[in-house]
Amino acid sequence: MTQFLPPNLLALFAPRDPIPYLPPLEKLPHEKHHNQPYCGIAPYIREFEDPRDAPPPTRAETREERMERKRREKIERRQQEVETELKMWDPHNDPNAQGDAFKTLFVARVNYDTTESKLRREFEVYGPIKRIHMVYSKRSGKPRGYAFIEYEHERDMHSAYKHADGKKIDGRRVLVDVERGRTVKGWRPRRLGGGLGGTRRGGADVNIRHSGRDDTSRYDERPGPSPLPHRDRDRDRERERRERSRERDKERERRRSRSRDRRRRSRSRDKEERRRSRERSKDKDRDRKRRSSRSRERARRERERKEELRGGGGDMAEPSEAGDAPPDDGPPGELGPDGPDGPEEKGRDRDRERRRSHRSERERRRDRDRDRDRDREHKRGERGSERGRDEARGGGGGQDNGLEGLGNDSRDMYMESEGGDGYLAPENGYLMEAAPE
């Protein structure tokens, strides 16, 4: 279909001109001709040097030997510098050391951001301060982390020396000591090979791990020929740390056991309380049933007694008729027409009824006293009392009169409720007459 396009569009589809041919700059590898062919090194062997005439090989320095050499050179150079500075060091003629040396306190390990006003606020609590000198680097002008504080009174310096050591200022615990440069004869600072610290004495086998005023003083003042006393101190410190850890573990276990015992006792108390409440509810239900049955029995006995009294009055009015029929309670054939068994039988009925009422009253009082004793024993938590109460309650259930199962308080209450003439207090709802002689 392109042949039907107009000429201007057909010109766009026309092919380009071919790439012009250029001759190569070099010949191809197979076209090259070598004038001199390859040969070996045999003709040149006679030009080599004789091995017998070669110089001996030079021994190169290894990496370990180079490091040891540099360390040795550094130590020698540092010793020379220390000897030179020792000749120039004189703390008594130092222009920066001013004031009384026995009133000056040395404070180290100070935070680099701590200012002089902050140090003054922290150390003024021990006494009035005369001057504070913070040490700065001469080259960079930055603080070096220690200062000298001069107090107006020597006693204030001693107080700060005792109580300010280990005080945390701006997140760092400072170390407090007296100024030893002008007070101790032959004293040398740490940079000149002296000082009290044992953390920079050498390698890991010589340095101590923990630094501080007390530890370093013990390190320097410890007598004995031991070449490495810090090992004994580290061993003692590790032993003390293990003992403290064991004591903390024992105390923690003791607290856990006490808490478990408290929980166990509380659970046992709750269980005992639930058991006693169930027993108390059962006793109350039993007492309620007993009272209802007693009330019904009492009403029945009252009706029977009224019927007997009513029937007994008819027998006494007509003795001739009563002689033919024997009474209900007495044996047949014993009562005559004029015999005195009728009034005696009534007296026995009254005595029997009185004993029954006394027994019911005693049982009611005994139940009430039992509940009261149970509550008392629950509050006291005495097992012996509870065991004695159970024995008393079990032993008093089979008695007829019910007084042996009662305590002294219950027996006294029962005696107080009974009158001097044989009458009981009107708690039963009616008064009982005394039995005839």
UniProtKB/Swiss-Prot annotation:
The Phosphoserine modification is found at: 226, 268, 320, 410
Q: Which residues carry this modification: N6-acetyllysine?
A: 118
Protein species of origin: Homo sapiens (Human)
Give the compositionally biased regions (Basic residues): 255-268
Please, one GO biological process term?
A: cellular response to retinoic acid
Phosphotyrosine occurs at: 126
Q: What else is known?
A: Major ribonucleoprotein antigen recognized by the sera from patients with autoimmune diseases, such as systemic lupus erythematosus.
Subcellular location per UniProt equals: Nucleus speckle; Nucleus, Nucleoplasm
Q: Name one Pfam family in it.
A: RRM_1
Using the UniProt entry, state the residues involved in the cross-link Glycyl lysine isopeptide (Lys-Gly) (interchain with G-Cter in SUMO2), renumbered to this chain.
346
Q: Which residues form the RRM domain?
A: 103-181
- Region Required for interaction with U1 RNA, annotated ranges: 92-202
Q: Which residues carry this modification: N-acetylthreonine?
A: 2
* Region annotation (Disordered) ranges: 48-79, 187-437
Listed Gly residues bias regions: 192-201
Which molecular-function annotations from GO does this UniProt entry contain? mRNA binding; RNA binding; U1 snRNA binding; U1 snRNP binding
Its protein name is U1 small nuclear ribonucleoprotein 70 kDa
Q: Taxonomically, which superkingdom?
A: Eukaryota
Domain characteristics, as noted in the entry = The RRM domain mediates interaction with U1 RNA.
| Subunit structure as annotated in this protein's UniProt entry | Component of the U1 snRNP. The U1 snRNP is composed of the U1 snRNA and the 7 core Sm proteins SNRPB, SNRPD1, SNRPD2, SNRPD3, SNRPE, SNRPF and SNRPG that assemble in a heptameric protein ring on the Sm site of the small nuclear RNA to form the core snRNP, and at least three U1 snRNP-specific proteins SNRNP70/U1-70K, SNRPA/U1-A and SNRPC/U1-C. Interacts with SCNM1. Found in a pre-mRNA splicing complex with SFRS4, SFRS5, SNRNP70, SNRPA1, SRRM1 and SRRM2. Found in a pre-mRNA exonic splicing enhancer (ESE) complex with SNRNP70, SNRPA1, SRRM1 and TRA2B/SFRS10.
According to its UniProt entry, the function of this protein is described as: Component of the spliceosomal U1 snRNP, which is essential for recognition of the pre-mRNA 5' splice-site and the subsequent assembly of the spliceosome. SNRNP70 binds to the loop I region of U1-snRNA.
TM ranges are: none
